[in-house]
């Protein structure tokens, strides 16, 4: 049994932020229906394509069922409205106001389903001076101050991180809000509309933003990277004063600077001593043994390929295998939830566009085969071949 078995989710979102929320809910047992436009989700062409499924689309949409609907047609709008009437949750990530203009906004959907909970994920919110703006993760990472901080601290030109932090933050917070709203709706029989901005989510999860609020100087609290004799790097966590004290105690390191020297001079001297001490270790394994002896927390400087192959990653099943659509298996990152008495995790395959049209309409709406055929003929419903 899975925690969310019996929960129905209509996922109108695309790209990453909304689909992440849908993927999590699916892994937890919900029946998640991805509604895809005729042109397909843009992530269908991002990443390596195997058997008609690209890597980005696979990661965010595996386990969902798929229906392709043309929302430019009145019959398509009606179909989504009918599906929402049977759903517990709706996820969408259009710009503010777009759902209303399409005729499937909150006022319409809540009228046909008063217990519905709907999460609208946008860059800058459903209302406000910039609600109309388009947003991707890179836009929010620039606007939130994240890129500026890293560029300033590292003394380099601004570059976007090679990870969609803003998308995943929004997806995770959207999932939390949806589950809270579902709990309330089941207790009160009253649904709710969640206005979740990627900017809000990004800034809430920024543990350094208090420096800007307090107008105080940023002090980096993370660890430092050190190099061993063979040129490999590894990380020791904690502020340098903590690292120095541990190494000094464990290995009798000596700082030759006078006791009355300026603090900056002492720190520079001790940093050089630690750098030379670690550089005398032949490789990362030797340095890790040293860190363990000193009682210091450490981390390997892994490539992504190394990270997914570590003993812990393998033991935890961080990468699992699903149907590759050609009789084989394909790797995918597993969701991180491990319950002691429930099942969880991705199951099934990543769907082709419109692959489950007939099955979904029969399951949710009891639509007849003849009606489904007519919807296909009228190109209200579409398939990947169209």
Give residue ranges: language-model regions.
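A short glycine-threonine-serine/GTX helix/turn-capping micro-motif
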Residues: 159-169, 221-223, 234-235, 260-261, ...
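Aromatic-enriched alpha-helical interface/lid elements that frame and gate functional surfaces
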Residues: 222-294, 298, 385
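N-terminal helix-loop segment corresponding to the beta1-alpha1 unit
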Residues: 1-187, 285, 352, 358-386
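A glycine-rich dinucleotide-binding beta-alpha-beta segment and adjacent secondary-structure elements
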Residues: 294-346
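Flexible, small-/acidic-enriched active-site or ligand-binding loops
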Residues: 215, 327-374
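Short, well-structured beta-strand/strand-turn elements
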Residues: 32, 292-306, 367-373
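Conserved Rossmann-fold dehydrogenase catalytic segment
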Residues: 126, 155-164, 186-199, 216-218, ...
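Oxidoreductase and adenylate-handling cofactor-binding alpha/beta cores
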Residues: 171-192, 204, 210-212, 248-254
